[in-house]
């Protein structure tokens, strides 16, 4: 059975670090999930817009990595909107350095997940419940989460120091 793909949306250095951390971590916790991230999963020479559009049409789960720096980025809103138009899809905003009250519409319409242990665990349970016959039993899922949480927590902590660089002056 093919793995369930999860689209990881990001924009900016800190958001990219969060998405990268999730891409590495998710398959350890739920082995039947295959995260997809543009930075890593588009081959050199491929048409990136075509690749992203194809992924957005064929996934049922997406995680939008939000940070204070990218809340108003058009691409984040585009990807969230594209994911939300798919029948039976879920769009999970993952808030790094943000509170749910920091997020405005249209992204506020999605029930946000804070990048902390308790809320991330709830997100994992949501993703697992969407795996249609491939989900892990709750005890096994909780054990895997506890085993791998420290790795994600470390990577999320390291992402806090990642900020956008000033654009070069002409």
Protein language model features and the residues they cover:
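Conserved N-terminal substructure of TIR/SEFIR domains
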Residues: 1-62, 84-89, 170
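C-terminal interaction surface of TIR/SEFIR-family domains
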Residues: 1-27, 97-170
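Conserved TIR/SEFIR loop-to-helix hotspot centered on a Trp-containing motif
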Residues: 2, 68-86
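Arginine/glycine-rich "motif VI" loop of SF2 helicases in the C-terminal RecA-like domain
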Residues: 28, 81-91, 96, 102-103
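Conserved beta-strand scaffold positions in the cores of enzyme catalytic domains, especially
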Residues: 35, 90-92, 112-114
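Short beta-alpha junction loops
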Residues: 41, 68-69, 94-100
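Generic structural "secondary-structure junction" signal
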Residues: 44, 73, 78-80, 105, ...
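Short, well-ordered beta-strand core segments
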Residues: 62-63, 112
């Amino acid at each position: 059975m093919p793995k369930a793909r999860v689209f990881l949306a990001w924009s900016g250095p800190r958001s990219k670090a969060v998405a990268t951390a999730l891409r590495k971590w998710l398959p350890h916790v739920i082995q039947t999930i295959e995260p997809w991230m543009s930075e890593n999963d588009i081959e050199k020479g491929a048409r990136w817009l075509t690749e992203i559009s194809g992924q957005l049409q064929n996934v049922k789960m997406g995680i939008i990595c939000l940070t204070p720096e990218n809340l108003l980025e058009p691409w984040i809103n585009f990807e969230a909107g594209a994911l939300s138009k798919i029948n039976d899809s879920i769009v999970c905003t993952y808030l790094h350095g943000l509170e749910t009250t920091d997020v405005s519409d249209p992204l506020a319409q999605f029930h946000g997940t804070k990048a902390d242990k308790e809320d991330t665990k709830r997100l994992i349970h949501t993703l697992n419940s969407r795996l249609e016959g491939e989900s892990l039993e709750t005890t096994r899922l909780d054990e895997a989460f506890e085993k791998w949480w420290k790795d994600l927590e470390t990577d999320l902590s390291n992402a806090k120091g990642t900020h956008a660089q000033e654009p070069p002056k002409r």
